[in-house]
Amino acid sequence: MSKFAKICVVVLCGITSVFCTSCENMFSVDYRIVGSWQVSHTYLNDVEIDSTIYLGYAPQTYYNIYADHVMSVMARYGGEYRESSFAFWVADQKNKTVNFQYTFYGKVYDFTADILKLNRNEFTIEFTDEKGDRWRLQMFSRSRH
């Protein structure tokens, strides 16, 4: 192998390792979860529902998730959209879960959900609440069209 070919191989290996390292973050939950998501389908114990007293889980609710682990939840209440307060999220890449904590209209929401699907257009989570009811929220991206 010529000296030029060896240099080319070394350079290509270096570029590939740098590229793979920087792309690794693109596949992490922390990277992919960031965006604006709209709840399109809500399931309670495997039955799709159109409304619920838990505004944070209702269809047409927005989860605006930011990279610094802050978020906002916006839901319809009294014909207007209202926004949550004290909203945070933390993802666990290894266990494929996400914890959401926020206060919305006097109710504190604090739950850890299994991530069933997360890609650039769809985000589906499932969790069991303190009463033992199983919720599944299917959300679609509002920020990546």
Predicted segment positions?
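Bacterial N-terminal signal peptides that target proteins for export
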Residues: M1-V9
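Repetitive helical segments and hydrophobic/amphipathic motifs
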Residues: L12-I15
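C-terminal motif of bacterial Sec signal peptides marking the signal peptidase cleavage site
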Residues: V18-S22
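Lipid interaction determinants
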Residues: E24-S85, Q93-H145
